[in-house]
Design a protein with these regions (language model features):
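Residue-level signal for mature regions of secreted extracellular proteins and peptides
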Residues: 2-5, 216, 268-271
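Conserved alpha-helical substructure of the radical SAM core
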Residues: 2-48, 52-69
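Short cysteine clusters
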Residues: 5, 9-12, 223, 238, ...
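Conserved phosphate-coordination/catalytic loops
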Residues: 23-27, 121, 269
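A generic local structural motif
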Residues: 30-32, 84-88, 262-264
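Conserved AdoMet/S-adenosylmethionine-binding subsite of the radical SAM
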Residues: 54-184
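A C-terminal junction/extension of Radical SAM enzymes
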Residues: 138-238
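Flexible mid-to-C-terminal extensions adjoining Fe-S/redox cofactors in radical SAM and related proteins
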Residues: 234-285
Length: 285
Protein backbone atom coordinates (compact mmCIF):
# COMPACT_ATOMS: atom_id res chain seq x y z
CA UNK A 1 0.00 0.00 0.00
CA UNK A 2 3.04 2.22 -0.16
CA UNK A 3 6.64 2.72 0.90
CA UNK A 4 5.94 4.78 3.99
CA UNK A 5 7.02 3.06 7.20
CA UNK A 6 7.69 4.10 10.78
CA UNK A 7 10.94 2.11 10.65
CA UNK A 8 14.15 2.17 8.61
CA UNK A 9 15.42 -1.43 8.65
CA UNK A 10 18.85 -2.30 7.28
CA UNK A 11 17.69 -5.33 5.25
CA UNK A 12 14.56 -3.73 3.75
CA UNK A 13 14.29 -4.57 0.05
CA UNK A 14 11.61 -1.88 -0.34
CA UNK A 15 13.88 0.84 1.10
CA UNK A 16 10.85 1.93 3.11
CA UNK A 17 11.00 4.65 5.75
CA UNK A 18 9.22 7.54 7.50
CA UNK A 19 10.02 10.02 4.72
CA UNK A 20 8.76 7.93 1.82
CA UNK A 21 5.82 9.51 -0.04
CA UNK A 22 4.66 6.70 -2.34
CA UNK A 23 1.19 5.70 -1.14
CA UNK A 24 -1.70 3.86 -2.78
CA UNK A 25 -4.53 6.30 -3.54
CA UNK A 26 -8.24 5.64 -2.95
CA UNK A 27 -8.88 5.22 -6.69
CA UNK A 28 -6.36 2.37 -6.86
CA UNK A 29 -7.83 0.78 -3.73
CA UNK A 30 -11.23 0.85 -5.46
CA UNK A 31 -9.66 -0.84 -8.49
CA UNK A 32 -8.36 -3.60 -6.22
CA UNK A 33 -11.80 -4.06 -4.69
CA UNK A 34 -13.40 -4.17 -8.14
CA UNK A 35 -11.08 -7.02 -9.09
CA UNK A 36 -12.04 -8.89 -5.91
CA UNK A 37 -15.72 -8.48 -6.79
CA UNK A 38 -15.29 -9.74 -10.37
CA UNK A 39 -13.09 -12.73 -9.66
CA UNK A 40 -12.91 -15.68 -7.31
CA UNK A 41 -9.75 -14.50 -5.60
CA UNK A 42 -9.36 -16.40 -2.36
CA UNK A 43 -6.91 -14.17 -0.52
CA UNK A 44 -5.29 -10.76 -0.48
CA UNK A 45 -1.91 -10.14 1.16
CA UNK A 46 -1.49 -6.51 2.21
CA UNK A 47 2.00 -5.14 2.70
CA UNK A 48 4.07 -1.95 2.61
CA UNK A 49 6.15 -0.23 4.06
CA UNK A 50 3.83 -0.31 7.00
CA UNK A 51 0.45 -0.76 5.26
CA UNK A 52 -1.42 0.45 8.34
CA UNK A 53 -0.11 3.99 7.70
CA UNK A 54 -2.06 4.25 4.47
CA UNK A 55 -5.29 6.21 5.16
CA UNK A 56 -7.32 3.72 3.08
CA UNK A 57 -5.94 0.60 4.78
CA UNK A 58 -8.88 -0.15 7.08
CA UNK A 59 -11.37 0.47 4.30
CA UNK A 60 -9.62 -2.10 2.10
CA UNK A 61 -9.49 -4.67 4.90
CA UNK A 62 -13.15 -4.27 5.86
CA UNK A 63 -14.38 -4.34 2.26
CA UNK A 64 -12.29 -7.38 1.34
CA UNK A 65 -13.54 -9.26 4.40
CA UNK A 66 -17.14 -8.35 3.56
CA UNK A 67 -16.58 -9.97 0.15
CA UNK A 68 -15.46 -13.19 1.84
CA UNK A 69 -11.80 -12.75 0.93
CA UNK A 70 -9.08 -14.08 3.21
CA UNK A 71 -7.05 -11.08 4.38
CA UNK A 72 -3.40 -11.36 5.41
CA UNK A 73 -1.49 -8.31 6.63
CA UNK A 74 2.29 -7.97 6.90
CA UNK A 75 3.06 -5.84 9.94
CA UNK A 76 6.20 -4.71 11.75
CA UNK A 77 4.34 -4.67 15.12
CA UNK A 78 5.94 -1.40 16.25
CA UNK A 79 3.44 0.53 14.14
CA UNK A 80 0.84 -0.30 16.80
CA UNK A 81 2.31 2.52 18.89
CA UNK A 82 2.24 5.23 16.23
CA UNK A 83 -0.20 8.15 16.28
CA UNK A 84 -3.73 7.32 15.07
CA UNK A 85 -3.11 3.57 15.49
CA UNK A 86 -5.28 3.25 18.61
CA UNK A 87 -7.40 0.12 18.49
CA UNK A 88 -5.39 -1.48 15.68
CA UNK A 89 -5.01 -4.89 17.41
CA UNK A 90 -8.74 -4.92 18.15
CA UNK A 91 -9.45 -3.99 14.53
CA UNK A 92 -7.42 -6.98 13.39
CA UNK A 93 -9.16 -9.32 15.79
CA UNK A 94 -12.63 -8.01 14.96
CA UNK A 95 -12.05 -8.69 11.27
CA UNK A 96 -10.23 -12.02 11.79
CA UNK A 97 -7.24 -10.71 9.86
CA UNK A 98 -4.31 -13.11 9.56
CA UNK A 99 -1.15 -11.43 10.79
CA UNK A 100 2.33 -12.06 9.44
CA UNK A 101 4.72 -10.10 11.63
CA UNK A 102 8.34 -9.27 10.96
CA UNK A 103 10.53 -10.35 13.87
CA UNK A 104 14.17 -10.81 12.80
CA UNK A 105 15.26 -12.44 16.09
CA UNK A 106 13.93 -13.57 19.46
CA UNK A 107 16.49 -11.49 21.36
CA UNK A 108 16.51 -7.77 22.03
CA UNK A 109 20.04 -7.28 20.71
CA UNK A 110 19.25 -9.12 17.48
CA UNK A 111 16.09 -7.16 16.73
CA UNK A 112 17.36 -3.72 17.72
CA UNK A 113 20.50 -4.16 15.61
CA UNK A 114 18.32 -4.44 12.50
CA UNK A 115 15.32 -2.28 13.37
CA UNK A 116 16.55 0.32 15.82
CA UNK A 117 16.69 0.80 19.57
CA UNK A 118 13.49 -0.07 21.40
CA UNK A 119 11.98 -2.05 18.53
CA UNK A 120 12.14 -5.37 20.36
CA UNK A 121 10.33 -4.19 23.49
CA UNK A 122 7.56 -2.64 21.39
CA UNK A 123 7.27 -5.87 19.39
CA UNK A 124 6.95 -7.99 22.53
CA UNK A 125 4.32 -5.64 23.94
CA UNK A 126 2.35 -5.80 20.69
CA UNK A 127 2.57 -9.59 20.63
CA UNK A 128 1.30 -9.79 24.19
CA UNK A 129 -1.72 -7.73 23.18
CA UNK A 130 -2.36 -9.95 20.16
CA UNK A 131 -2.10 -13.11 22.27
CA UNK A 132 -4.61 -11.58 24.66
CA UNK A 133 -7.02 -11.17 21.75
CA UNK A 134 -6.73 -14.84 20.80
CA UNK A 135 -3.97 -14.64 18.21
CA UNK A 136 -1.51 -17.51 18.06
CA UNK A 137 -3.48 -19.82 20.36
CA UNK A 138 -3.26 -22.75 17.95
CA UNK A 139 -6.96 -22.80 17.09
CA UNK A 140 -6.36 -21.39 13.61
CA UNK A 141 -9.10 -18.78 14.04
CA UNK A 142 -6.69 -15.87 14.45
CA UNK A 143 -3.42 -16.90 12.89
CA UNK A 144 -0.20 -15.18 13.94
CA UNK A 145 2.96 -15.96 11.99
CA UNK A 146 6.45 -14.48 11.92
CA UNK A 147 8.84 -13.70 9.10
CA UNK A 148 12.56 -14.12 9.62
CA UNK A 149 15.34 -12.61 7.51
CA UNK A 150 19.05 -13.13 8.26
CA UNK A 151 20.86 -10.16 9.76
CA UNK A 152 23.55 -10.24 7.07
CA UNK A 153 24.79 -11.62 3.76
CA UNK A 154 24.27 -15.31 4.46
CA UNK A 155 21.56 -17.93 4.00
CA UNK A 156 19.04 -18.50 6.79
CA UNK A 157 19.05 -21.65 8.95
CA UNK A 158 16.47 -24.43 8.37
CA UNK A 159 12.94 -23.14 8.87
CA UNK A 160 11.67 -25.99 11.08
CA UNK A 161 14.60 -25.74 13.47
CA UNK A 162 14.37 -21.97 13.71
CA UNK A 163 10.61 -22.10 14.32
CA UNK A 164 11.20 -24.47 17.24
CA UNK A 165 13.80 -22.08 18.65
CA UNK A 166 11.46 -19.10 18.35
CA UNK A 167 8.55 -20.92 19.99
CA UNK A 168 10.67 -22.19 22.86
CA UNK A 169 12.45 -18.92 23.61
CA UNK A 170 9.51 -16.54 23.20
CA UNK A 171 7.32 -18.74 25.38
CA UNK A 172 10.01 -19.22 28.02
CA UNK A 173 11.06 -15.58 28.21
CA UNK A 174 7.83 -13.70 27.57
CA UNK A 175 4.92 -16.16 27.46
CA UNK A 176 4.39 -15.38 23.76
CA UNK A 177 2.84 -17.97 21.45
CA UNK A 178 2.40 -17.99 17.66
CA UNK A 179 1.42 -20.37 14.88
CA UNK A 180 4.26 -20.54 12.37
CA UNK A 181 7.46 -18.95 11.13
CA UNK A 182 8.47 -18.27 7.54
CA UNK A 183 12.12 -17.95 6.59
CA UNK A 184 13.16 -15.65 3.75
CA UNK A 185 16.56 -15.17 2.18
CA UNK A 186 17.60 -11.53 1.92
CA UNK A 187 17.12 -10.16 -1.59
CA UNK A 188 20.14 -8.34 -3.08
CA UNK A 189 17.95 -5.35 -3.94
CA UNK A 190 16.87 -2.11 -2.27
CA UNK A 191 18.56 -1.00 0.93
CA UNK A 192 20.19 -4.40 1.46
CA UNK A 193 21.86 -4.16 -1.94
CA UNK A 194 23.24 -0.74 -0.99
CA UNK A 195 24.81 -2.29 2.10
CA UNK A 196 26.31 -5.12 0.06
CA UNK A 197 27.86 -2.62 -2.34
CA UNK A 198 29.19 -0.50 0.52
CA UNK A 199 30.81 -3.59 2.07
CA UNK A 200 32.16 -4.79 -1.30
CA UNK A 201 30.25 -8.07 -0.87
CA UNK A 202 27.56 -7.93 -3.55
CA UNK A 203 29.35 -10.21 -6.00
CA UNK A 204 30.23 -12.72 -3.28
CA UNK A 205 26.65 -12.83 -1.99
CA UNK A 206 25.16 -13.20 -5.47
CA UNK A 207 27.57 -16.05 -6.17
CA UNK A 208 26.53 -17.76 -2.94
CA UNK A 209 22.87 -17.55 -3.96
CA UNK A 210 23.60 -19.04 -7.36
CA UNK A 211 25.74 -21.85 -5.91
CA UNK A 212 22.92 -22.69 -3.50
CA UNK A 213 20.27 -23.08 -6.21
CA UNK A 214 17.78 -25.83 -5.32
CA UNK A 215 15.52 -26.97 -8.15
CA UNK A 216 13.08 -28.53 -5.67
CA UNK A 217 11.99 -25.04 -4.60
CA UNK A 218 10.57 -24.12 -8.01
CA UNK A 219 7.14 -25.63 -7.44
CA UNK A 220 6.41 -23.42 -4.45
CA UNK A 221 7.60 -20.04 -5.69
CA UNK A 222 5.21 -17.19 -4.91
CA UNK A 223 5.35 -15.80 -8.44
CA UNK A 224 3.59 -18.91 -9.76
CA UNK A 225 0.26 -18.34 -8.04
CA UNK A 226 0.10 -14.65 -7.15
CA UNK A 227 0.19 -11.17 -8.66
CA UNK A 228 1.81 -8.18 -6.97
CA UNK A 229 -0.02 -4.85 -7.15
CA UNK A 230 2.19 -1.79 -6.74
CA UNK A 231 1.25 1.33 -4.81
CA UNK A 232 0.35 2.94 -8.16
CA UNK A 233 -1.68 -0.03 -9.40
CA UNK A 234 0.94 -1.45 -11.74
CA UNK A 235 1.19 -5.24 -11.88
CA UNK A 236 4.20 -7.46 -11.23
CA UNK A 237 4.99 -11.15 -10.87
CA UNK A 238 6.17 -10.62 -7.30
CA UNK A 239 6.98 -7.99 -4.70
CA UNK A 240 10.66 -8.10 -5.58
CA UNK A 241 10.09 -7.48 -9.28
CA UNK A 242 7.88 -4.58 -8.21
CA UNK A 243 10.76 -2.89 -6.41
CA UNK A 244 12.97 -3.35 -9.48
CA UNK A 245 10.30 -2.00 -11.83
CA UNK A 246 10.01 -5.29 -13.73
CA UNK A 247 6.33 -5.17 -14.66
CA UNK A 248 4.36 -7.91 -16.36
CA UNK A 249 5.24 -8.61 -19.97
CA UNK A 250 3.50 -6.29 -22.46
CA UNK A 251 1.30 -9.17 -23.61
CA UNK A 252 -0.48 -9.18 -20.25
CA UNK A 253 -2.46 -6.62 -18.22
CA UNK A 254 -0.12 -3.94 -16.86
CA UNK A 255 -2.42 -2.17 -14.36
CA UNK A 256 -4.92 -3.38 -11.78
CA UNK A 257 -7.72 -1.51 -13.58
CA UNK A 258 -7.10 -3.74 -16.63
CA UNK A 259 -6.75 -7.02 -14.76
CA UNK A 260 -8.43 -10.06 -16.28
CA UNK A 261 -7.40 -13.12 -14.29
CA UNK A 262 -7.99 -15.50 -17.20
CA UNK A 263 -5.40 -13.64 -19.28
CA UNK A 264 -2.74 -14.46 -16.69
CA UNK A 265 -3.06 -18.23 -16.98
CA UNK A 266 0.18 -19.71 -18.28
CA UNK A 267 1.90 -16.34 -18.36
CA UNK A 268 5.67 -16.11 -18.74
CA UNK A 269 7.26 -14.87 -15.51
CA UNK A 270 10.01 -12.25 -15.74
CA UNK A 271 13.19 -13.39 -14.03
CA UNK A 272 16.60 -11.90 -13.29
CA UNK A 273 19.58 -12.69 -11.09
CA UNK A 274 17.80 -11.63 -7.88
CA UNK A 275 15.44 -14.59 -8.33
CA UNK A 276 18.19 -16.90 -7.05
CA UNK A 277 17.37 -15.65 -3.54
CA UNK A 278 14.00 -17.45 -3.68
CA UNK A 279 15.57 -20.69 -4.93
CA UNK A 280 18.65 -20.82 -2.70
CA UNK A 281 18.90 -23.56 -0.07
CA UNK A 282 15.48 -24.36 1.38
CA UNK A 283 13.90 -21.57 -0.68
CA UNK A 284 11.60 -18.69 0.24
CA UNK A 285 7.83 -18.95 -0.11
Amino acid sequence: MGHRCNMHCTHCHVSAGPREKKQMERETVEDVIAVLRRNEIKSIDITGGAPELNPHFRYLVETAKALGTRVVVRTNLTVFFEDAMDGLPEFYAGNSVEIVASLPCYTEAGVDAVRGRGAFQKSIQALGTLNGLGYGDGSGEKRLSFVFNPAGAFLPPPQCRLEDDYKRELQRRFGISFDSLYVFTNMPIGRFRDILIKNHSLEKYQSELERSFNGRTLGGLMCKDMISVGWDGKLYDCDFNQILGLGLDENYPRHISELDVMRLIGREIRVDEHCYACTAGQGST
